[in-house]
Amino acid sequence: MAIKFLEVIKPFCVILPEIQKPERKIQFKEKVLWTAITLFIFLVCCQIPLFGIMSSDSADPFYWMRVILASNRGTLMELGISPIVTSGLIMQLLAGAKIIEVGDTPKDRALFNGAQKLFGMIITIGQSIVYVMTGMYGDPSEMGAGICLLITIQLFVAGLIVLLLDELLQKGYGLGSGISLFIATNICETIVWKAFSPTTVNTGRGMEFEGAIIALFHLLATRTDKVRALREAFYRQNLPNLMNLIATIFVFAVVIYFQGFRVDLPIKSARYRGQYNTYPIKLFYTSNIPIILQSALVSNLYVISQMLSARFSGNLLVSLLGTWSDTSSGGPARAYPVGGLCYYLSPPESFGSVLEDPVHAVVYIVFMLGSCAFFSKTWIEVSGSSAKDVAKQLKEQQMVMRGHRETSMVHELNRYIPTAAAFGGLCIGALSVLADFLGAIGSGTGILLAVTIIYQYFEIFVKEQSEVGSMGALLF
């Protein structure tokens, strides 16, 4: 079944656009340059509006997911990284359910990656059509078939650019991956904007600045009651406040602290006597992968629910999946789930919301913890990081675990790696829930992604620096 599936995909993989692997070792300075170019292209696409749209001022159905999916409404980056992570989610679920199996051979791995890219392109086309036909840019009947086709083509080409930019970095030309880079940039931009935004918003209390820090100084300067001004700056509703900012900094610190948790397994060289080392198994063994896949699952559920609600709003099954309400308090118009499954899988808006609807909070916590643990556990099987894969890597490096023979290494690693993957995913989910309940800026999922990605880039810099010798030699 598995080989047949991969062989069916093979003819399509040949015609897919592909970035060739570098024929030489790419220097660190070149990697930094290519990473900067990739980021520049992404940011430019985030600012180029789609040609032909009649309106994008209606309530945004994906407002709550845009920070995580690195998308920007009404621009070429409307879809963001959603097609990539959705295709990864589908392939992982198929592999995890043993519907397809990926062998250890480079050929099977390459075919698996090709299948993921193919699904990514198909999903890009599908999401583009859904976005246009559900009226996100105006009534399709008023725009006409030509304009609808033009918008769909723009979204597809932009999605293809994102796929290739991600592959460019993954193949070794840049640092990290395009997905991680785009997510971290989007989240950090959101946090800085919510802290220092000079945009004014007309509230029931008068004109206020959106940025939490700027609002603090503005309230202190304009209000005669300074104590009340401080209270508003720390606890104001529907706009970023200082407690949100403090919660964000706190979650950053907690995640960085947990990044250092690991178990070091002693290993030794099978060839050279007396050469010892350690193999680290981190608490966050699968890093941010569980939260990315969980976000992809929820975002696609939102897309389906929104699409069905727009067409069959009175249907009972559609209402059970999700009912939506438009709101514009404290920012742009956006749609938010107020009932059905989508409501219970979305984070509570604040700690007060937790007290008002504890069932919602409990269901959300169970879903986050369970899904993150599941995705983390299954990811190691398809990503080459399972106990069997690690034992094979150590064997190729002629390393063995101290006190164990080569044949027993897999059994010993199985005691640690699956547990670390599941428990690490559980911790990622718990930290995300904590950040949501504390009201951290950018959502709990967004903060988790930003911290883990920034920490990954920090580790890359440290590794490169140790190889070169100094930061100056590294960059100049």
UniProtKB/Swiss-Prot annotation:
The lineage of its organism: Eukaryota, Metazoa, Chordata, Craniata, Vertebrata. One of its GO terms (biological process) is response to type II interferon. Gene3D superfamilies: SecY subunit domain. SUPFAM superfamilies: Preprotein translocase SecY subunit (SSF103491). InterPro entries: SecY/SEC61-alpha, SecY_CS, SecY_dom_sf, Translocon_Sec61/SecY_plug_dom. Residues 54-76, 139-144, 194-240, 310-354, 442-445 are lumenal. The chain crosses the membrane at residues 34-53, 77-96, 118-138, 145-165, 173-193, 241-261, 289-309, 355-375, 421-441, 446-462. GO terms for cellular component: endoplasmic reticulum membrane; membrane; Sec61 translocon complex. Pfam families: Plug_translocon (PF10559), SecY (PF00344). Its main location: endoplasmic reticulum. The SEC61 channel-forming translocon complex consists of channel-forming core components SEC61A1, SEC61B and SEC61G and different auxiliary components such as SEC62 and SEC63. The SEC61 channel associates with the multi-pass translocon (MPT) complex. It comes from the Eukaryota. Component of SEC61 channel-forming translocon complex that mediates transport of signal peptide-containing precursor polypeptides across the endoplasmic reticulum (ER). Forms a ribosome receptor and a gated pore in the ER membrane, both functions required for cotranslational translocation of nascent polypeptides. May cooperate with auxiliary protein SEC62, SEC63 and HSPA5/BiP to enable post-translational transport of small presecretory proteins. Keywords: Chaperone, Disease variant, Endoplasmic reticulum, Membrane, Protein transport, Translocation, Transmembrane, Transmembrane helix, Transport. This is Protein transport protein Sec61 subunit alpha isoform 1. It is linked to Tubulointerstitial kidney disease, autosomal dominant 5: A form of autosomal dominant tubulointerstitial kidney disease, a genetically heterogeneous disorder characterized by slowly progressive loss of kidney function, bland urinary sediment, hyperuricemia, absent or mildly increased albuminuria, lack of severe hypertension during the early stages, and normal or small kidneys on ultrasound.
